[in-house]
C-alpha cells in the first residue's frame, strides 16, 4: 500500500511539473484581482514618498518595463522606433556566438543606424555611431557593442517619454500591480503542496505549485518547535537573511528564494525547484567525472560563488551534496544555512563539513572572508575527479584526523591530472591564505583567469549555453521516495511549547523578492490578468457613464488624495461601510459609490489621528470632539500607511493654521469656510490622479 501511495505521489508531482512548464497560467487555481484604477491616487503618493517614481526605478522593473514598452508601442508613435531599436539591441546581447552577433550587429546597423544616417534623421550622437562603426570595421562584436546607443535611448525615454507615461493609464496599471505586490501575505492556502523531496535538521522540502500563477517551486518548511528544541533560531533567521541577499540580480547558479512566510508552527522558504538530484548522488551513480566534465561544473559554481561574494556573503558549506542539478543538467548552489555576511565583520566560527573546511576556518580565533569558499571549491573539485575529499583518504571518518590532515598535509595530486588542473588545484588548496588562488585581491576573477579555464567563454557559462555532461532522466523524480526520506518523530517535540516571545522572533520573517515575483507574473498570468481587467474596467466605465455617475469629482480641486476605504463610526452601526474618500487640506469627505459627496469631517472636529487594531486588522482611528470616534479600514498595507500619513500631516498642518487664525469675539465661525479661505498650498494636489 505504501508503494502504491509513493507511485501515485510521484505521478501527481510529475504531471504538475509538466503542466506547469507548458501552460502555468492554466494551472492557476486562484485569480489575481487588480484593485480599482482609483488606487493610483494613493499608490502614486506612496511610491513618490519612497523615491520610486523615477524613470530608472520603473524601467528597471520587469512589469514597469513591459507597461512602459506597451505605452510607447501603442500610444506614442514617435517613441515606437526607439523601443524597437532597444529590443533589437537586447536580443543581440543575449546571442551565444560571435557568428550570430556578427550577423545581428550588421542587421541592426543597417536598419537602425545607416538607414537613419542616409535619410538625415539619425537622432543619436556622432560618438555613438563611431563607436559601433569602428568595431564593426575591425570585426569586433562584443556583447556591449551598442551600449552607447542604449544609454542615449534611455536618455530620450527619460526626457521625452517618461512624463507622458506617468500621465497615462499604463502608469495607473503599474500602480495597480505594485499595490498587489506590496500587499502579498502568503499562507499555506496559496500553494498546492506535492510530495516530499528532501529532509534536513529542522524540517522537510516539498515540491509545490503557487496557486495564483501555477508556477512550481520547492517549499522548505522548518518546524518552529524543532528549531526551539535545538536552539536553532539564529540559524533559521540567518538563512532567511542570506537568501534575501543573494536572491536579487541575475544569477542562475544559486537556489534562490522568491518568498518567505510563516505559520504558527512552521517557517517556509519558497525556493527554485531543482529536479535533477545533487552532485553527490550523481557521483555515486555515474562514477568520477573527467576533467572536461568537472570544468563544466566548476565554471557554473564559480559564477555562483562570485555572485555571493559580490554581496559579501561567504557560503562556508561547499560540497557535492549541496550542488543541485536542474532538469537540463545545469547546477545551482543550495542551502545557505551556514552562509555568513562579512560586509561589516569577518566571521571566526569553525563551521562547515569536515574535509571541505579551509585551514583558516579550522583555526580558532582566525578571521576569514570569501577565502574559505575557494579552498572548499578545491576540495570539492578533487572529490568529483577522485571520489573522495583530498583530506579524507582511506575512507577515514575521524573528524579530528580529517581536520589535522587539512591543517598539515601536503595534497598529493595524481600524475594523471593535466598540468593545468594540477596548477588550479594547487592554487585553490594552498594552506597559506595570502598565496591562495582567489584570495590575492581580485576574487573570482583570479580563478576565472586560471589557465585551466582558458578555453571557457564566461558569457556562454552565464547564459547556460554549454551542454551539460550529464542530463538527469526525464519523467522521473530524482529524489528518494517518501518512505526512504523518512519523517521526524513527533515525540521529540511533544513537550516543547511555543510562547508569544518565540513567535515575536519571527515577526519580520515574511518577505517577497520583488524582481522574482514580477518575473513570475510576467512569465505566467500578466497578459491574462491585464486583458480581463481591461474588459471589466471598460464595462464599469460604460455603466457609470450611462448612469451619469461623476468620476472626476477631485479634478481641479485642492484634493490631496482619494480612494476607497471602509468606515465604522455610527454608534448604532457595527458593520463596515465601503465608501469613497477625498482628503482636502481642511476636511475629509466621503460618499457611497455613484453618489455626490454628502458627508464630511473637518480637521477642526478631529482631536487625534491614531492607529488601532480591529480583529487583527490595523485600522486608522480618528478621535472626534465630544468623545466620538471614527474608524477607517484600508484594503491593503500601502493604503493604510499612506492614508495614515496623509491624515496626520493634514491634521497637524490644519491645527497649526487654526492656532494662527485670530479668535474673533462674539462671532461664531464655520471651520470649513474659515479654513477654506486659506488653503494649504504647500501640500501637493493629486489633481484627480
From Swiss-Prot:
Reaction(s) catalysed by this chain's protein: [beta-adrenergic receptor] + ATP = [beta-adrenergic receptor]-phosphate + ADP + H(+)
One protein family per Pfam: Pkinase
GO biological process, one term: negative regulation of relaxation of smooth muscle
Subunit structure of this chain's protein: Interacts with the heterodimer formed by GNB1 and GNG2. Interacts with GIT1. Interacts with, and phosphorylates chemokine-stimulated CCR5. Interacts with ARRB1. Interacts with LPAR1 and LPAR2. Interacts with RALA in response to LPAR1 activation. ADRBK1 and RALA mutually inhibit each other's binding to LPAR1. Interacts with ADRB2.
Domain AGC-kinase C-terminal stretches: 454-521
Site (Required for receptor phosphorylation): 3-4, 10
Keyword Nucleotide-binding belongs to the record: yes
Name this protein carries in UniProt: Beta-adrenergic receptor kinase 1
Recorded name of the encoding gene: GRK2
Subcellular localization: Cytoplasm; Cell membrane; Postsynapse; Presynapse
Amino acid at each position: 500500500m505504501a508503494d502504491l501511495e509513493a507511485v501515485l505521489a510521484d505521478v501527481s508531482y510529475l504531471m504538475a511539473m509538466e503542466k506547469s512548464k507548458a501552460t502555468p497560467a492554466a494551472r492557476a487555481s486562484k485569480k489575481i484581482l487588480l484593485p480599482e484604477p482609483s488606487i493610483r491616487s494613493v499608490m502614486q503618493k506612496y511610491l513618490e514618498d519612497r523615491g520610486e517614481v523615477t524613470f530608472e526605478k520603473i524601467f528597471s522593473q520587469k512589469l514597469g518595463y513591459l507597461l512602459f514598452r506597451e505605452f510607447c508601442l501603442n500610444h506614442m508613435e514617435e517613441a515606437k522606433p526607439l523601443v524597437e531599436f532597444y529590443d533589437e539591441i537586447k536580443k543581440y546581447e543575449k546571442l551565444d556566438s560571435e557568428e550570430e552577433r556578427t550577423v545581428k550587429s550588421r542587421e541592426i546597423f543597417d536598419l537602425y543606424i545607416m538607414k537613419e544616417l542616409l535619410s538625415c534623421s539619425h537622432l543619436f550622437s556622432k560618438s555613438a555611431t563611431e563607436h559601433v562603426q569602428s568595431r564593426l570595421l575591425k570585426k569586433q562584436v562584443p556583447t556591449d557593442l551598442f551600449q552607447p546607443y542604449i544609454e542615449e535611448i534611455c536618455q530620450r525615454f527619460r526626457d521625452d517619454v517618461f512624463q507622458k507615461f506617468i500621465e497615462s493609464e499604463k502608469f495607473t496599471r503599474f500602480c495597480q500591480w505594485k499595490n498587489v505586490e506590496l500587499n502579498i501575505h502568503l499562507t499555506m492556502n496559496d500553494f498546492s503542496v506535492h510530495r516530499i523531496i528532501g529532509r534536513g535538521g529542522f524540517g522537510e522540502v516539498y515540491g509545490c505549485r503557487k496557486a495564483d500563477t501555477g508556477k512550481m517551486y520547492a517549499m522548505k518548511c522548518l518546524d518552529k518547535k524543532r528549531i526551539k528544541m535545538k536552539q536553532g533560531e539564529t540559524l533559521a533567521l540567518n538563512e532567511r537573511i542570506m537568501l534575501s541577499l543573494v536572491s536579487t540580480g541575475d544569477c542562475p547558479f544559486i537556489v534562490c528564494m522568491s518568498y518567505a512566510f510563516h505559520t504558527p508552527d512552521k517557517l517556509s522558504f519558497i525556493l527554485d525547484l531543482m529536479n535533477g538530484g545533487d552532485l553527490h548522488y550523481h557521483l555515486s551513480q555515474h562514477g568520477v567525472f573527467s576533467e572536461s566534465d568537472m570544468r563544466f561544473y566548476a565554471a557554473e559554481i564559480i559564477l555562483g560563488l562570485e555572485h555571493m561574494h559580490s554581496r559579501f556573503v561567504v557560503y562556508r558549506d561547499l560540497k557535492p551534496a549541496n550542488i543541485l542539478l536542474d532538469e537540463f543538467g545545469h547546477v545551482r548552489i543550495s542551502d545557505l544555512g551556514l552562509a555568513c555576511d562579512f560586509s561589516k565583520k569577518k566571521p571566526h566560527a569553525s563551521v562547515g563539513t569536515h574535509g571541505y573546511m579551509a585551514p583558516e576556518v579550522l583555526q580558532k580565533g582566525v578571521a576569514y572572508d570569501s577565502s574559505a569558499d575557494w579552498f572548499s571549491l578545491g576540495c570539492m573539485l578533487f572529490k568529483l575527479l577522485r571520489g573522495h575529499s583530498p583530506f579524507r583518504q582511506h575512507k577515514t571518518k575521524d573528524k579530528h584526523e580529517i581536520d589535522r590532515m587539512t591543517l598539515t598535509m601536503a595534497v598529493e595530486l595524481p600524475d594523471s591530472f593535466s598540468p593545468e588542473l594540477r596548477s588550479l588545484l594547487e592554487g585553490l588548496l594552498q594552506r597559506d591564505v595570502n598565496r591562495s588562488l582567489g584570495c590575492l585581491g581580485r576574487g573570482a576573477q583570479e580563478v576565472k583567469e586560471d589557465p585551466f579555464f582558458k578555453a571557457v567563454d564566461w558569457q556562454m557559462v552565464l547564459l547556460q549555453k554549454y551542454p551539460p555532461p550529464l542530463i538527469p532522466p526525464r519523467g522521473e523524480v530524482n529524489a528518494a521516495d517518501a518512505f526512504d526520506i523518512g519523517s521526524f518523530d513527533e515525540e521529540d517535540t511533544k513537550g516543547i511549547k511555543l510562547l508569544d516571545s518565540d513567535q515575536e522572533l519571527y515577526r519580520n520573517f515574511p518577505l517577497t523578492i520583488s524582481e522574482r515575483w514580477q518575473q513570475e507574473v510576467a512569465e505566467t498570468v500578466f497578459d491574462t490578468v491585464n486583458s480581463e481587467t481591461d474588459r471589466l474596467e471598460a464595462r464599469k466605465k460604460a455603466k457609470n457613464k450611462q448612469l451619469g455617475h461623476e468620476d472626476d469629482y477631485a479634478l481641479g480641486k485642492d484634493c490631496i488624495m482619494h480612494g476607497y476605504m471602509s468606515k465604522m463610526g455610527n454608534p448604532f452601526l457595527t458593520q463596515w461601510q465601503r465608501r469613497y474618500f477625498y482628503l482636502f487640506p481642511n476636511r475629509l469627505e466621503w460618499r457611497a459609490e455613484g453618489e455626490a459627496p454628502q458627508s464630511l469631517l473637518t480637521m477642526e472636529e478631529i482631536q487625534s489621528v491614531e492607529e488601532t487594531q480591529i480583529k487583527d486588522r490595523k485600522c486608522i482611528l480618528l478621535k472626534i470632539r465630544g468623545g466620538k470616534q471614527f474608524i477607517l479600514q484600508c484594503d491593503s498595507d500601502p493604503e493604510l500607511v499612506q492614508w495614515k500619513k496623509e491624515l496626520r500631516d493634514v491634521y497637524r498642518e490644519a491645527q497649526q493654521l487654526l492656532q494662527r487664525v485670530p479668535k474673533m469675539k462674539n462671532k461664531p465661525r464655520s471651520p470649513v469656510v474659515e479654513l477654506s479661505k486659506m488653503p494649504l498650498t504647500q501640500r501637493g494636489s493629486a489633481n484627480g490622479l
